[in-house]
């Protein structure tokens, strides 16, 4: 892998390595502390922390997803594969893959795996199958069970519960290699929310920036959690994906401190990429008649909430927030051809604009 500090391996690669090590230990009694795993990108050497035979025809292996430069909740997790070697009695699959403790189960449609199956995604399944078939005797079947002892606990920190994946985390990966701060991996996880909502035939979807927006939306709107789509910082990406899937209109709900960036054409709201909140607020305050003294106060403010207090003092709060909401709506129509119902709120969930449709209230 290039630039080792910035790449790691996926849970799918570790699961494959453990499966391969367990099978090798059944076929060869020598100690196994490293295996070569063929991924869609390249062959990787994966260290095995423990491997032991359970019987003449079964074994288990454990490996950890080693740290790399990424805030990944699965880093450091132990992944276990138990392999049982059976006599082949039919022309069916030679490698049977299932899940154990800590691997989630699919309970809702719209995902890559059918309802009722363990959340071991297609690429990891193929990796396990292809790597094991290289050394599997033709007259045998390998039954592989993947377990993640801490998976149930870690799952609470992921989007799995929202997506209907219960009881643990998912075994994922598309290339076998995890890249530092990989926007692709994160995007792949959040866009799944749209697929699940569409599979459930839900109308009146509500897009929010994150957990705070979701909490406030559930408090203020007549909707369920399933209607809510979190965009994270990737607002533009999520809107593009919604449009690709035939969604033309929805509600965009959230704290003005996040949503105001969209009024300025900033569709990735990560602070390090762009801010502009103060400048956008000042522009709309000026449009709505704020004098120079008020504009200077806004410029000197540290937070969006402080700016709202200043607008309140000048009785400009509603006009400015309506202007910002309209700008957000216009930006999204121009960029994505989306008709948004924009609702701006403060940290308490109080509505800041009133130029929105009220069908969800």
Swiss-Prot record:
GO molecular function: cobalt-precorrin-5B C1-methyltransferase activity
Record Gene3D superfamilies: CbiD-like (3.30.2110.10)
InterPro entries referenced in this protein's UniProt entry, alphabetically: CbiD (IPR002748), CbiD_sf (IPR036074)
Gene Ontology BP terms: anaerobic cobalamin biosynthetic process; methylation
Pathway as given in its UniProt record: Cofactor biosynthesis; adenosylcobalamin biosynthesis; cob(II)yrinate a,c-diamide from sirohydrochlorin (anaerobic route): step 6/10
Catalytic class of the enzyme: transferase
The keyword Signal is annotated on this UniProt entry: no
Catalytic activity of the protein: Co-precorrin-5B + S-adenosyl-L-methionine = Co-precorrin-6A + S-adenosyl-L-homocysteine
E.C. numbers: 2.1.1.195
Keywords (A to Z) from UniProt: Cobalamin biosynthesis, Methyltransferase, S-adenosyl-L-methionine, Transferase
Signal peptide: none
Family statement drawn from the similarity comment of this UniProt entry: Belongs to the CbiD family.
Name of the protein in question: Cobalt-precorrin-5B C(1)-methyltransferase
Native source species: Methanobrevibacter smithii (strain ATCC 35061 / DSM 861 / OCM 144 / PS)
Gene: cbiD
């Amino acid at each position: 892998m290039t630039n080792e500090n910035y790449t790691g391996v996926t849970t799918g690669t570790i699961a494959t390595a453990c499966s391969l090590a367990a099978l090798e230990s059944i076929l060869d009694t020598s100690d196994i502390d490293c295996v070569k795993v063929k991924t869609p990108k390249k062959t990787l050497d994966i260290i095995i922390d423990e491997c032991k035979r359970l019987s003449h025809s079964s074994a288990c292996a454990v490996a950890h997803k080693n740290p790399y430069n990424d805030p990944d909740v699965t880093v450091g997790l132990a992944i276990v594969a138990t392999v049982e070697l059976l006599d082949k009695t039919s022309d069916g699959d030679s490698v049977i893959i299932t899940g154990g403790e800590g691997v989630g189960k699919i309970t809702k449609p719209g995902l890559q795996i059918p309802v009722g199956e363990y959340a071991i995604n297609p690429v990891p399944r193929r990796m396990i199958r292809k790597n094991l078939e290289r050394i599997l005797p033709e007259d045998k079947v390998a039954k592989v069970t993947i377990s993640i002892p801490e998976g149930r606990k870690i799952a609470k920190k992921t989007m799995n519960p929202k997506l209907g994946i219960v009881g643990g985390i998912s075994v994922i990966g598309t290339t076998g290699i995890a890249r530092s701060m990989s926007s692709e991996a994160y995007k792949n996880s959040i866009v799944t929310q749209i697929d699940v909502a569409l599979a459930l035939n839900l109308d009146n979807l509500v897009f929010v920036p994150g957990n705070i927006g979701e909490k406030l939306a559930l408090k203020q709107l007549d909707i369920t959690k399933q209607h809510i789509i979190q965009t994270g910082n990737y607002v533009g990406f999520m809107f593009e994906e919604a449009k690709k899937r035939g969604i033309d209109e929805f509600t965009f709900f959230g704290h003005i401190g996040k949503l105001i960036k969209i009024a300025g054409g900033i569709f990735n709201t990560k602070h390090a990429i762009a801010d502009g909140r103060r400048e956008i607020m000042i522009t709309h305050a000026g449009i709505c008649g704020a004098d120079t003294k008020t504009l200077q106060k806004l410029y000197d403010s540290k937070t969006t909430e402080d700016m709202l207090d200043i607008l309140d003092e000048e009785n400009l709060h509603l006009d400015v927030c309506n202007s910002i909401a309209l700008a957000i709506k216009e930006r999204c129509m121009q960029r994505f051809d989306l008709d948004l119902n924009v609702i701006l709120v403060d940290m308490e969930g109080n509505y800041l604009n009133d130029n929105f449709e009220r069908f969800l209230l």
